[in-house]
Each structure stands twice: as structure tokens, then as C-alpha cells.
Amino acid sequence: MPLYEHVMIARQDLSNSQAEGLIEHFGAVLSDNGGKLVDQEYWGVKTMAYKINKNRKGHYAFLRSDAPSSAVQEMERLMRLHDDVMRVLTIKVEEHAEGPSVQMQKRDERDNRRERR
């Protein structure tokens, strides 16, 4: 089956548990249609470069999946219809990268910096 990576932005007024619940919900949609969610990362609330639907911030989530194209199309369709999801980006990849995504690596590197004066 083809491999995909998805980035989803949800509304800023959701709680963290609600945003993570969306990830679980769309992972279940994939598995119901014959695919599987390989990995998921919740990146937290981030400021966007421009407003989307009058929102300056959003909950970012990253999903890696191994699913047939019909399952991915159904998941994207449901994401676009869902009121809490503002944007979705899906790309097809040859292979999934090992370890955490670049966003999560940056967060880890920030912890190693010395304190400001």
C-alpha cells in the first residue's frame, strides 16, 4: 500500500484533548477503510503566518499512514467537512522517515540551549 504523510490544522479554541481526539477519530477512519495509522504527532498550538477563518493560531497534528488511496480520500473528505479542521495537507512519500519529525526535533533541541540573561 502507498505511504502518506498528513498535516492537519484544527481551530485554536479546542482543548488539547479535543485536538488529540480528532487525531484518533481520523486514524479510526483510515483503519475502517483498510489502512493503518503508522505514527502520529501532536505539535501543539502554533501561530500561523496569516489568518485562516479569523484564527491566528491552530492545533497542528502530523500523521503517517499506510493506506489505499480510497481510504485517504475518504479521510480527507471527512476532514474538509469537519467544522474543527481548518486545513489539511496530504503528500505521498516513498518511505517514512525514522524517528520524530523535524518539528519535534526542533522542540527537543530548544531544551538543550542555555538560559538567557
Curated annotation (Swiss-Prot):
<keyword id="KW-0689">Ribosomal protein</keyword>
<dbReference type="InterPro" id="IPR000529">
    <property type="entry name" value="Ribosomal_bS6"/>
</dbReference>
<dbReference type="GO" id="GO:0022627">
    <property type="term" value="C:cytosolic small ribosomal subunit"/>
</dbReference>
<keyword id="KW-0687">Ribonucleoprotein</keyword>
<keyword id="KW-0699">rRNA-binding</keyword>
<dbReference type="GO" id="GO:0003735">
    <property type="term" value="F:structural constituent of ribosome"/>
</dbReference>
<dbReference type="GO" id="GO:0006412">
    <property type="term" value="P:translation"/>
</dbReference>
<comment type="function">
    <text>Binds together with bS18 to 16S ribosomal RNA.</text>
</comment>
<feature type="compositionally biased region" description="Basic and acidic residues">
    <location>
        <begin position="105"/>
        <end position="117"/>
    </location>
</feature>
<feature type="region of interest" description="Disordered">
    <location>
        <begin position="96"/>
        <end position="117"/>
    </location>
</feature>
<protein>
    <recommendedName>
        <fullName>Small ribosomal subunit protein bS6</fullName>
    </recommendedName>
</protein>
<dbReference type="Pfam" id="PF01250">
    <property type="entry name" value="Ribosomal_S6"/>
</dbReference>
<comment type="similarity">
    <text>Belongs to the bacterial ribosomal protein bS6 family.</text>
</comment>
<dbReference type="InterPro" id="IPR014717">
    <property type="entry name" value="Transl_elong_EF1B/ribsomal_bS6"/>
</dbReference>
<dbReference type="GO" id="GO:0070181">
    <property type="term" value="F:small ribosomal subunit rRNA binding"/>
</dbReference>
<dbReference type="InterPro" id="IPR035980">
    <property type="entry name" value="Ribosomal_bS6_sf"/>
</dbReference>
<dbReference type="InterPro" id="IPR020814">
    <property type="entry name" value="Ribosomal_S6_plastid/chlpt"/>
</dbReference>
<keyword id="KW-0694">RNA-binding</keyword>
